[in-house]
């Protein structure tokens, strides 16, 4: 599954601020679509746009990213994976004097994007003075940013990028919740929990910290101004100061915001999921501009001459000029809560929970489905792909949805089987279908015959969620809380079936806990069991004859003593990469373990990586390029791993980057190797420069010799030796060094 074109971090930020030359953009687009090793990428739901700001281009913010759109509708995203320090954006504002974008987060941290820099202003975030430091809005006022918070107005120096002062509209220097500030040429207005206040301005700064209370407008929640005219906006009423009677009222809709302009006031409002945009003229008559055809929950707006941009928290970004259209920002259209599936061609991600449909991800990017072949999709909770015909399968309650891509045909299948809802489905390599029905048992399809295999005991509903099937035809199923692990085994014709329950007792499983949360099959056939107390590893034969006890891997802890691997961690999910390493999702982030679990290679959390949340629900690994997808309690992100699936036969390999530019200091990857290959790199005369083992089907070189020195400019040859000792030349790589 190829990746989308990417820019380097500095190129990206320059492009993001509208400073990118077209040649750079074309160069980036012409590069291989494979992202660099170790790169993180966000796969967020971008259908909810929350904030807009008009600068040299249009800037906007979804829940976790900011984006820019230029005059040609080229879209660039900036998130935690390429420079931002946080997620969950509270407000944005454009500073036209310094040409920089200010971003405030819900945790009260602040970033400023200026040129190729992202500057963090963490003073509010780090302060211990106030318990509630929530940021509500930002106003740019000359060289200052007025940040309205739950304790007052923080003045930020936009030149020095530091806190200048804190203002309190109640004149007491006591914390006062401030929602928004707005200004005219000579006055500053502050909307607070105690009402509306104003004070005099001179040279964009208050002349004294003496604020006057403005009576009335008790229902106001927003402010807007144009020249000397100030508006106070409530849920049902809009006022033009100093008049205390409304100039506009609505009885049904809720006013979300309003924006003053030279010909009146634009009003965005909604009734449930039906939104509208109105223009209130200077004579206080309204004209309808947009309705629910495009708008559902409009929340913000930006105006650029004859173009109106609207941020909608349900419908995304809408633009109106000579025509009206919705601008697609990509990504899955909903948060992924179903159980996904990935192979070398597609990632399928059911929405699950409340919304019918799913997202697919391929070399063409994200595509969202609420219908297939004209059929409305129900709520889908799990997905798989049949390896024999590449058709897509989904779970839909007690039925299955089968979609044939080549014929664009869809059918709902309700086999005469068990009555429970499907919670997981999968196919063996030879195309045998396995389905797990909650509270009921296993459904299997082989040779077009459906077979039902009921559970040996009565289960409560919502007890069975996950299952893996090995090459022996054994199904491994975590039981409900404190019920251990169940194993199903049968002969080929199902004439004999065996169920076995494994628990913490010796000779009966030796699991680290009876609360089993996850199970995974590794590349050697071992079963890895994740519990609420770490991991156990099973290597079992015929369960009707043999004892099946788990091996509990140990690892040195921070004190140097041996302890059980991930002891006291809740292991929510386990995935196996091409090098048989284990990616483990917990309540405390992601752990990458060596193949045998004897060492921890990486530990990613929201504090040291772009993970939006430390609770990991599912991990999916794309085998061809090694991209690892993490579905968290918030959103989905991915990481370009160093291991891929090995090929069956060695042929010419992919080397990237190649040629290696003088400024490049990252890893050089050799992809398309047979598993566990020995890779040798020689100079043109045949002298050995470096050798290494592949991680699955990919080897990594840092561009240095075995002695640790950077190699000289030149052409280098790549040789590969497989486990049988066969060696062949598979490629060349060009190294160029700077002067």
Residue ranges and their predicted role:
Residues 25, 647-680, 698-701:
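Glycine-centered coil/turn sites that cap beta-strands in beta-rich domains
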Residues 1-37:
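Bacterial Sec-dependent N-terminal signal peptides
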Residues 14, 30-653, 678, 688, ...:
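Carboxylate-rich, polar loop motifs that coordinate divalent cations or form catalytic acidic clusters
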Residues 717-739:
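C-terminal tail/sorting-segment detector
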Residues 125, 170, 695-696, 734:
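A generic structural motif
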């Amino acid at each position: 599954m190829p990746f989308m074109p990417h820019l380097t971090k500095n190129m990206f930020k320059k492009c993001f601020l509208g400073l990118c030359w077209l040649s750079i953009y074309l160069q980036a687009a012409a590069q291989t679509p494979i992202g660099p090793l170790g790169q993180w990428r966000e796969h967020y739901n971008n259908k909810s746009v929350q904030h807009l700001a008009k600068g040299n281009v249009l800037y906007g913010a979804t829940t976790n990213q900011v984006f820019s759109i230029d005059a040609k509708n080229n879209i660039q995203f900036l998130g935690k994976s390429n420079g931002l320090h946080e997620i969950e954006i509270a407000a944005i504002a454009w500073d036209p004097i310094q040409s920089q974008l200010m971003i405030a987060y819900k945790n009260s941290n602040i970033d400023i994007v200026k040129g190729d820099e992202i500057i963090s202003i963490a003073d509010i975030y780090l302060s211990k003075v106030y318990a509630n430091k929530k940021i509500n809005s930002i106003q740019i006022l000359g060289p200052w940013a007025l940040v309205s918070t739950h304790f007052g107005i923080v003045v930020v120096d936009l030149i020095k990028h530091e806190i200048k002062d804190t203002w309190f509209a109640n004149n007491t220097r006591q914390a006062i919740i401030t929602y928004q500030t707005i200004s005219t040429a000579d006055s500053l207005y502050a909307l607070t929990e105690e009402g509306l206040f104003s004070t005099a301005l001179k040279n964009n700064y208050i002349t004294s910290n003496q604020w006057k209370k403005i009576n009335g407008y008790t229902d106001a929640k927003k402010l807007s101004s144009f020249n000397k005219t100030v508006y106070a906006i409530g849920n049902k009423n809009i006022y033009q100061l100093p008049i205390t009677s409304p100039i506009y009222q609505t009885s049904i809709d809720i006013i979300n915001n309003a924006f003053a302009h030279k010909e009146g006031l634009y009003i965005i409002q909604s009734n449930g999921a039906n939104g509208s945009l109105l223009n209130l003229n200077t004579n206080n008559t309204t004209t309808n501009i947009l309705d629910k055809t495009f708008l559902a929950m409009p929340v913000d707006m930006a105006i650029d001459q004859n173009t109106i941009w609207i941020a909608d928290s349900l419908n995304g970004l809408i633009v109106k000029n000579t025509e009206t259209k919705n601008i697609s920002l990509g990504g899955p259209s909903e948060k992924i809560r179903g159980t996904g599936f990935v192979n070398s061609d597609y990632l399928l991600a059911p929405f699950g929970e409340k919304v019918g449909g799913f997202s697919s991800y391929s070399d063409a990017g994200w595509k969202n489905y609420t219908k297939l072949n004209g059929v409305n999709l129900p709520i889908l909770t799990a997905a798989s792909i049949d390896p024999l015909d590449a058709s897509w399968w989904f779970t839909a309650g007690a039925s299955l949805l089968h979609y044939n891509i080549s014929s664009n045909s869809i059918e709902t299948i309700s086999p005469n089987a068990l009555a429970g809802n499907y919670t997981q489905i999968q196919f063996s390599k030879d195309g045998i279908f396995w389905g797990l029905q909650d509270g009921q048992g296993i459904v299997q399809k082989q040779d077009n015959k459906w077979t039902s295999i009921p559970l040996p005991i009565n289960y409560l509903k919502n007890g069975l969620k996950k299952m893996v099937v090995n090459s022996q035809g054994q199904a491994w199923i975590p039981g409900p809380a404190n019920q251990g692990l169940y194993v199903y085994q049968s002969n080929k014709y199902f004439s004999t079936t065996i169920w076995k329950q494994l628990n913490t007792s010796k000779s009966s499983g030796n699991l680290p806990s009876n609360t089993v949360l996850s199970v995974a099959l590794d590349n050697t056939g071992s079963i890895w069991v994740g519990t609420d107390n770490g991991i156990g590893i099973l290597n079992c034969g015929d369960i009707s004859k043999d004892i099946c006890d788990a091996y509990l891997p140990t690892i040195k802890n921070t004190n140097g003593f041996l302890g059980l691997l991930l002891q006291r961690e809740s292991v929510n999910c386990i995935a196996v990469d091409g090098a048989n390493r284990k990616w483990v999702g917990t309540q405390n982030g992601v752990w990458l373990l060596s193949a045998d679990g004897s060492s921890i290679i990486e530990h990613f959390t929201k504090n040291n990586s772009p993970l939006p949340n430390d609770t990991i629900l599912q991990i999916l690994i794309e085998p061809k390029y090694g991209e690892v997808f993490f579905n968290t309690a918030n959103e989905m992100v991915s990481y370009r791993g160093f291991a891929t699936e090995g090929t069956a036969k060695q042929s010419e390999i992919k080397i990237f980057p190649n040629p290696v530019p003088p400024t490049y200091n990252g890893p050089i990857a050799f992809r398309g190797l047979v598993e566990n290959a020995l890779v040798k790199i020689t100079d043109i005369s045949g002298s050995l420069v470096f050798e290494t083992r592949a991680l699955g089907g990919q080897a990594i070189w840092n561009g240095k010799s075995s002695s640790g020195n950077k190699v000289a400019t030149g052409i280098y040859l790549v040789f590969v030796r497989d486990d049988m000792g066969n060696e062949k030349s598979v490629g060349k790589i060009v190294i160029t060094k700077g002067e």
